[in-house]
Amino acid sequence: MWRMPTDFRDGKTFPRRGREAIGDALWLARVADKGRAAAAGTIYDYIYPCPMDQGMMERWGISADEFNEALRRNPTDESLFAWFSDRVRDEDIRVANEWLVRERSENLDRQDAEEVAPVQSR
């Protein structure tokens, strides 16, 4: 039962990348990390739900309120994905993934470039 860190205030810890999937759903890991951090008050300078979060949720057919409730009730990725799989159709996951990869690849590339822990000086 793995839980990712959700305290991003140190500037060295980041939400998982948007390309990282839980099951077949891209972005789900990232939005879960950010939602959990927002609920804990440790989101730092991230925005939740940001326009990308909202775009994926819209394509999944769920609202931010539904997702927040699911996060509250499902503290692990495994239990969250069980809820998600029951709630979101495979076709909606496919459409959301395609939108993310085809139309938002610049955002994904920017995450990869910007969300890097600072190099420690000697």
Residue positions per predicted region:
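Charged interaction scaffolds used for protein-protein
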Residues: 77-90, 97-101
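Polar/charged low-complexity regulatory segments
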Residues: 2-43, 93-96, 100-122
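Amphipathic alpha-helical packing elements
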Residues: 43-84
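A generic structural signal for solvent-exposed, polar alpha-helical segments
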Residues: 14, 20, 33-34, 50-54, ...
